[in-house]
């Protein structure tokens, strides 16, 4: 699972050799520090892994951390919030992610026929 928060980007997986914990990885240490602090664990450096930083956390702790991250959403624009917490260089990378994901929009996403529109908003 890829997760973007106002403090960074992490990738969480459950390895077959350690099914009792989630291995949560990141490209930069700062992205993992809030989770490591909440879980009471140390960030492990693994320079030869696909992600250079990781923590091992119990599933319930990761779920609680995710819920806490969601409960802190008080902004109307994610990228602007990240510019405040991580700076503009990091935000530039988020724009690249946003642009890449724009390419995955399905063909009906910009449908203008009112009969085909959802009743919900945003």
Where are the language model's segments positioned?
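Structured alpha/beta or helical-core interaction and ligand-binding surfaces enriched in interleaved
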Residues: 1-122
């Amino acid at each position: 699972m890829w997760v973007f928060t106002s403090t960074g980007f992490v990738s969480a997986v459950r390895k077959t050799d350690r099914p009792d914990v989630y291995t949560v990885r990141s490209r930069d240490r700062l992205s993992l520090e809030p989770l490591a602090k909440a879980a009471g664990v140390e960030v492990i450096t693994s320079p030869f892994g696909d992600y250079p930083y990781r923590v091992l956390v119990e599933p319930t702790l990761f779920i609680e951390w995710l819920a806490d991250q969601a409960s802190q959403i008080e902004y109307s624009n994610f990228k602007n919030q990240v510019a405040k917490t991580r700076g503009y260089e990091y935000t530039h990378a988020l724009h690249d992610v946003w642009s890449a994901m724009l390419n995955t929009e399905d063909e009906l996403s910009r449908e203008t026929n009112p009969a085909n529109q959802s009743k919900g908003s945003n």
